[in-house]
A protein has these predicted regions:
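Active-site-flanking beta-strand signature of metal-NTP-handling nucleotidyl enzymes
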Residues: 1
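Catalytic palm active-site di-aspartate
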Residues: 36-48, 77
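Long, positively charged amphipathic alpha-helical accessory segments at protein N-termini or as interdomain linkers
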Residues: 4-33, 50-189
Length: 189
């Protein structure tokens, strides 16, 4: 649980620090040559298969212009198949044990996440938000012909390298309804 000092409209950017910390924790535990990517804003992929994602919660009564009483970053990662999904029929989905993480336990990933997240929060206090969001942007899956930035309110700004109009992708609606999460089964799908 976090106690933000910024209004909600800016405080929710901490989500990117959480996602970057999670991706880096999984990368640190991964076998060599394992690709770890984030699909904007909240889905985590290992070797281009969905393994999970992150979520951010805040009080329902929180106003965008006011400092919320709390924020909570949470994540769901599929470490092994639940039996509900046949991995042979769903190549777009995967589990950590299928990607060579057999010797890795959840405790190692949680510890790595905690270290990375605390470091990201410290970086944010010392060097500003741009420092904390760097690990996220480095893992963001995007076309090489685009530059990406995170706006003050957390929206993704996508700028073609060749110039042209910047595209804005709103964060708030995506946090309210994560596309990667099957709410009925409470697992990535």
């Amino acid at each position: 649980m976090l106690e933000p000092t910024d209004p909600l409209v800016r405080a929710r950017r901490v989500f990117y620090a959480g996602m970057g910390a999670l991706a880096d924790a999984i990368a640190a535990a991964a076998p060599p040559e394992t690709a770890i990517h984030i699909k904007w804003p909240d889905a985590l992929y290992v070797n281009w298969g969905l393994v999970g994602g992150g979520r951010l919660a805040w009080p329902n009564s929180a106003d965008e212009a006011s400092v919320p009483a709390w924020l909570v970053f949470g994540a769901t990662i599929r470490t092994a198949w639940s039996g509900r999904i046949d991995p042979g029929l769903t190549p777009e989905l995967t589990a950590l044990d299928e990607e060579g993480f057999a010797e890795v336990n959840s405790k190692q990933i949680v510890e790595g996440f905690a270290r990375n997240f605390m470091q990201a929060l410290d970086s944010c206090q010392e060097g500003g938000f741009a420092m904390a969001v760097r690990p996220y942007l480095e893992r963001l899956a995007r076309e090489s012909r685009h530059n990406c930035e995170i706006d003050e309110n957390g929206d993704l700004l996508v700028q073609p390298v060749s110039g042209g109009a910047t595209e804005r992708q709103a964060l708030l609606p995506r946090l309210k309804a994560p596309a990667w999460l099957d709410l009925a089964y409470k697992e990535p799908s």
